[in-house]
Amino acid sequence: MNRIRQCLILTMVMVIGLSARLAAADDAAQKLYDRVTPSLVVVQYVWQNELGRNELAGAGIVVSDDGLIATSLGLFSTQIPDEQMKDFKILIPRANGEPDELKATFEGRDERTNLAFLKAAEPRKDKKAWTPLKFEDVPAAIGDKVTSIGMLPKLVAYKTYYMESIVAATLRGDVPQVLVGEGLAAASSPVFNADGKAIGMVAVSQAQALLINKPEALVSIQAPPKLYVPASDFLLSFSDPPKAGHPLKLPWLGIPEMTGVAKAVADDLGLGDQPAIQVGDVIEDTPAAKAGLKQGDIIVKVNGQPLERGDQAQDLPGIFRRRMLRFKPGEKVTLSVLRDKGQPLTDIAVVLGEQPPQSDTAARFWADDMGFGVRDMVLIDNYVRKLEKDQKGVIVTVLRKSSAAESAGLHQEDLITQLNGQPVTDEGEFAKDYKAFRDQKPHEAVVLVVQRDGQETTVRIEPPQ
């Protein structure tokens, strides 16, 4: 009888202890939820392109006390020209009623970390101070508990919600990621360790909805994401964020094609387990070419440090590119390369240039009457199309469905080299000559000579009747 009584007492003690721990855990979760919720907002803007208007919105995190908001670069794709993004807003959810709307400025994209930034352009309507969230570089071990707090879609009033999981694995592709077992809150949500420190951000995945103002955002609740990016990968953005009117100047090497060296090849070259990448091509007159880097060179070290290992050889070029993005234009970087099997490494000092203009910043023109748009060529166009570096023309960017241009057989990505028998130099000249011709001869066809897949063809666009 005494033994039974002792067992009952022991069981009661264990139950009481477990209940206390569960209560403490519940209390900690509620405190974290209450602390983090004011740091979560909605960022919203209008993408006004040639074909119409689309309102985009996603989750944002307050990262400074002056209203600087971080969000995923995926929401502000580099394929969207800056001039087409308008009406930026920050929405602050309220427990009851519609969210407060604040005008905002777009500070810019940060391709180094895959983040974008906005800042409030007017005071908060509720008169409250901003509550920035501080991220810390704290690694998580297998089996560690992690939590995330995200924002539900517009359909459920942007309410915040809490998720718990366990670290299952660490992955190293182009971007370092941590895999969890159960699931996390929606893309761009902050991730916390057991001490309540913000240690990462939920990764954006092709399978997960990024736009929280669309019905498909519910997918993130029904099938929660399981990957997050550790803070070590993006803290740079918070200490050196882009600023409105002053986009970040990114470094430029001029090596568009690289291949990760497979283990068997590395062994044959005597590199053993050392990660390496092989240069596939070097663009003429770029920093890499001027420094003497050659096709076939095998890069083994950067500034004396071995390349970072990826889970697969194919991950190495992406890892290398992201590492190079951490430097600044004008900095000197020493690349140690292997040129001949069994020979010592050759050190090549490269003074990094500034990344040339990209397609999203190229000047554009929209021929509304014929239903097509064009932009200036950029350096990468010449490289991808294997054109001479002095090739002139404009690139077709968009076609309106059932337009005169589409009906005539014009294709997106066509390179227009002639307009009505005259050479096309750039967007400015094309726009001027096109508008002049349409004003003077509105009933005559527009005749374009285009290059497509290495072949030249003529497209005759009859004016709409």
Predicted regions and their residues:
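C-terminal cap/linker of serine protease catalytic domains
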Residues: 27-33, 85, 104, 152-155, ...
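Active-site region of chymotrypsin-like
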Residues: 36-53, 121-132, 158-224, 272-280, ...
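Catalytic histidine site
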Residues: 41-44, 49-83, 189-192, 201-204, ...
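Conserved PDZ fold ligand-binding element
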Residues: 69-71, 195-199, 288-316, 405-428
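N-terminal activation segment of mature serine protease catalytic domains
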Residues: 23-72, 112-116, 141, 146, ...
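Catalytic-histidine neighborhood of serine endopeptidases
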Residues: 64-113, 122-123, 204-209, 215-217, ...
